[in-house]
Amino acid sequence: MKTILLLFVFLLIGSSLNAQVEYSSNSQFLKSAPIFSIDAASYKSSKEGKTRVDFFIQVPYANIQFVKKGNEFLASYNITLTFYAEDKSRIIFESIWKEKLSAESFEETNSTDNFNISYKFFDLTPGKYNLKCTVEDSDSRKSTSREFPLNIREIVDSLDLSDLLLVTDVIKDSLGESIVPNVARMVTNKTTELSVYLEIYSNKNQLAYIDFTMKDIKNGKNFNQLSPQELKKGINKVIHTF
C-alpha cells in the first residue's frame, strides 16, 4: 500500500532576494564596475553530514570591459567567494577563479541579451554563514562585492526537499533535460510561464502530493497548484511550471 504524503512548497514573487544584486538604470554606473546577480540553492550531498550548495553568478556582457584583439573582442573577470563564520570572526574558506569571454562583434559586447553564468558547488556543513561574492574586471581592475547571510540546512533521506531554483528554460535533447537558471530572477508582465526546479528525496517508493503556493506580494494574491508525484527511492528531480 502506498503512503500518501503532503509536501508544501512556497514561492514569493515580487520580492528581492538577499543574494540578488539589483541593476542600476544609470549606464555610466553599469560601466564603472561589473554588476552581477548571484543565486544559491541547497541539495542533498553524497558526503555524510554535508549539504551541497550550488552557486550561480550571472554577469551581463555589457557590464564587462572587452578589448579588441584581431577579429574578436575578449574579456575576462575574476570571481571570489569568501565564506565567513556567522559572526564574521574568521574566514572558513575561499574560492577564486577566472572567467573568459569572447565576442565576434562590438554589438555583442553591448547587448543586454548576452550574459555569462558561472557555476560552482561546494559540500558544506549545515549551519549559518556569511558569504561575500566579489567580481573583478581583469582589464579595468574595478570590482563589485555583495555580502549576505547564508543559512544552510540539513537535508534528510526519509522525505525532504531541496531549495527551489527559478529557471528560464528547459532544454531537452538526446542526453536528457538540462535547465537554464533565472539567476537575476527577472519576472515581468510579459512572462507567461514560471518554472521552478527542485529535488525530492525519499527513502522508499511512495506517492506524494506537492502543494505549490506562489504569492504575489504586490497584490497579496496566492496561486495554488497540487501536483501528484510518484516518488522513487533516492533522488527525484521535478520541474514544475505555473
What label would you give each PLM region?
Residues 20-242:
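Intrinsically disordered, low-complexity terminal regions enriched in Ser/Thr/Pro/Gly
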Residues 3-15:
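Sec-dependent N-terminal signal peptides
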